[in-house]
């Protein structure tokens, strides 16, 4: 049984807000609703689900000729949690005040999703010279998790799109760049022993402190001498240690210490090269501090990463966008 198609984007936004598609929870009801609306307009769509949970899914759809490069409208369907926040209206009910619609995700970014879906439906009635594509993803808020599956599925797509418009909230300004990010977990290993004999054992926290010191030194060098992109509030690559956990008791030399850190890089910087610098400097600091011969450097694993974006401001895509803002 079909349900009526909304008359406009605000009406669809009200529907979308009602789906509690919080990150890491199922979004399939929202996706099914969008898919049904597209089908009613004669637009086929494809789902690319999370391999571990089919209730979380991406959606991809196209209208127009597929033998020429087109434009992608891309948005995520997940929203951040509302727990513990002082909402004055139900977060998953659209509330209109003073010409604005309030609700979780109204700006980030179900408002754009609603506009994109309605644009697809209207485009299906037009003789398009280029295709219009719709890409909806899940779990963007925790590191663009869902779209990775979608991108792999779209790799064979030919011809590649001419332009992708990602409708994140920008106060209607055109954003041409975004820093890349790489998050890491470092396990620093030592040897447990009584603190009265501490010099005989490798102290994992000491290794972690050498790592953190190296992070600070590399950060200082990047701030002073690294490439700069003036469009950002912090115009250079940053490194940051966010959490540290280690040790079991004051009188026991710690056998393990875990440090979680990240690199947020401008497009000109390679996070792999920065990580290599950090680890080389960590080893240098360990030797300088007189680390025992069997002390090993931190074991680093990548938790999450995504590349940065640097679109030339004189590109055809930016020029096209400026015409329609």
Give the ranges of each region predicted by the language model.
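Metal-dependent amide/peptide-bond hydrolase catalytic core
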Residues: 4, 185-324
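Predominant activation on well-ordered alpha-helical scaffold segments within soluble catalytic domains
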Residues: 14, 114-117, 121, 148-151, ...
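A short, glycine/Asx- and small/polar-enriched loop/turn
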Residues: 54-57, 65-68, 179-181, 233-237, ...
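Acidic-glycine-rich active-site phosphate/pyrophosphate-binding loop
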Residues: 82-96, 161, 176-187
């Amino acid at each position: 049984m079909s349900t009526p198609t909304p008359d406009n984007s605000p009406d669809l936004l009200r529907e979308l807000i009602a789906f509690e598609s919080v990150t890491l929870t199922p979004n399939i009801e929202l996706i099914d609703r969008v898919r049904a609306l597209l089908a009613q307009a004669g637009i086929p769509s494809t789902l690319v689900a999370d391999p571990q949970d089919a209730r979380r899914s991406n959606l991809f759809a196209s209208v127009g000729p597929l033998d020429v490069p087109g434009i992608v409208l891309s948005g995520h369907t997940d929203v951040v949690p509302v727990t513990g926040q002082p909402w004055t209206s139900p977060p998953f009910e659209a509330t209109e005040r003073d010409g604005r619609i309030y609700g979780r995700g109204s700006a980030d970014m179900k408002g754009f999703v609603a506009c994109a879906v309605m644009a697809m439906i209207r485009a299906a009635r037009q003789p398009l010279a280029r295709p219009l594509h719709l890409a909806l993803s899940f779990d963007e808020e925790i590191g663009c998790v869902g779209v990775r599956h979608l991108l792999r599925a779209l790799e064979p797509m030919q011809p590649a799109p001419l332009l992708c418009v990602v409708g994140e909230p920008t106060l209607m300004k055109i954003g041409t760049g975004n820093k890349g990010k790489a998050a890491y977990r470092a396990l620093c290993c030592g040897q447990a022993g009584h603190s009265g004999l501490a010099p005989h054992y490798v102290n994992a926290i000491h290794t972690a402190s050498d790592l953190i010191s190296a992070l600070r030194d590399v950060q200082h060098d990047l701030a002073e001498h690294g490439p700069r992109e003036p469009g950002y509030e912090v115009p250079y690559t940053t490194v940051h240690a966010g959490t540290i956990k280690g040790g079991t008791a004051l009188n026991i030399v710690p056998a393990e210490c875990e440090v979680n850190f990240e690199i947020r890089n401008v497009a000109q910087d390679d996070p792999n090269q920065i990580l290599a610098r950090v680890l080389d400097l960590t080893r240098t600091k360990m030797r300088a501090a007189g680390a025992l011969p069997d002390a090993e450097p931190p074991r680093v694993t990548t938790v999450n990463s995504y590349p940065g974006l640097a679109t030339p401001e004189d590109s055809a895509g930016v020029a096209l966008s400026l015409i329609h803002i």
